[in-house]
Amino acid sequence: MAAAAEQQQQQQQQGFRPLDEASLVAYIKATPALAARLGGSLDALTIKEVGDGNLNFVYIVLSDAGSVVIKQALPYIRCVGDSWPMTRERAYFEASALQKHRGLCPDHVPEVYHFDRAMSLIGMRYIEPPHIILRKGLIAGVEYPLLAEHMADYMAKTLFFTSLLYNSTTDHKKGVAQYCDNVEMCRLTEQVVFSDPYMLAKYNRCTSPFLDNDAAAVREDAELKLEIAELKSMFIERAQALLHGDLHTGSIMVTPDSTQVIDPEFAFYGPMGYDIGAFLGNLILAYFSQDGHADQANDRKAYKKWILKTIEDSWNLFHKKFVELWNKHKDGNGEAYLPPIYNSSELLCLAQKKYMTSLFHDSLGFGSAKMIRRIVGIAHVEDFESIEDASKRASCERRALNCAKAILKGRRQFESIGQVIVHVQSFDRD
């Protein structure tokens, strides 16, 4: 208790205080950028806490004339408590990444209205209904016809324009330097994605007792450990582009014709395949969860086909858009492939093919790692958790886990996303 009180006193001295609904109103009134967005009278605001995440408080603030979302980072992991401290500086990196990515892809990133570093507080656009979290839409069996197009656009632009394919090494190093201080969030990822699932760890869990042997098999799989070590090293060492850092289906809000990417508090310069893999891997998890949500009225078979098509389209469209950007800017400031060296279309094409093949295999590896950790690690996904029958849930999870292990180990053998889809389908049976 004394330590907690001392920590609270230090935070107040630094200008930080956690806001509740009452103090949030006072804060808004004292902050012109937020007050202007809400307009009119600020004495009749509607405030709703909506944070269902693991780390932060999130409030929707509505007035007769406008709306904002307020997000405040806490100095600990919310889903665990103050026994697991966590830097509040993640709010700075989230605000910075939102602003940078919105500049590159304004159609799919919400606007930041206000950032208060001392308070670890972001005021941003309220992504209004009928937008919902993509994960919830996937659980409900809703099709999003533009999802693949939109996410391919987002990933191609945010990754290409923050890489050495577009930037000079000087500018790239400046970006890396800015985000390297987000080390605590990166270390959290290192722990929960690349370490804990492969050993006995305090916060690991699985659908017990059904998956106890499956979790043990992960911890005892030497080949899997060798592959995950390679991915962990790449995650830590390879500053390829400015990543979102947590691009799962809970970080995307959608309607049938709109896609908005939120929550980049894990942003850092890392391997592009980590973002791509997070998105594709979470779609594969959604695919394997569908049997647990099927009923007599809807067997979900048609929806499962739509998910597979979305996975395939997402990669293929990303590949197309990314290479198009590369070709468009091949004579620009990018220093990875200098025009005097790659001085023929044939040579550039070969370089692009090698680059994209490597990126494809990276994406498969990271996507598989993200799948595994959601089944035998600390933080699971609602896709599976909302399946009430534990035996049925475990059956869905086991298929996903076995699929992920196989893809991770054999990722370099795949030559197309179509081959991956066939492979995924081969695990979709008891």
From Swiss-Prot:
It catalyses: 5-(methylsulfanyl)-D-ribose + ATP = 5-(methylsulfanyl)-alpha-D-ribose 1-phosphate + ADP + H(+). InterPro entries: Aminoglycoside_PTrfase, Kinase-like_dom_sf, Methylthioribose_kinase. Pathway: Amino-acid biosynthesis; L-methionine biosynthesis via salvage pathway; S-methyl-5-thio-alpha-D-ribose 1-phosphate from S-methyl-5'-thioadenosine (hydrolase route): step 2/2. It is an enzyme of class 2 (transferase). Induction: By sulfur starvation. Substrate binds at residues 56, 246, 373. Belongs to the methylthioribose kinase family. Catalyzes the phosphorylation of methylthioribose into methylthioribose-1-phosphate. This is Methylthioribose kinase 1. It comes from Oryza sativa subsp. japonica.
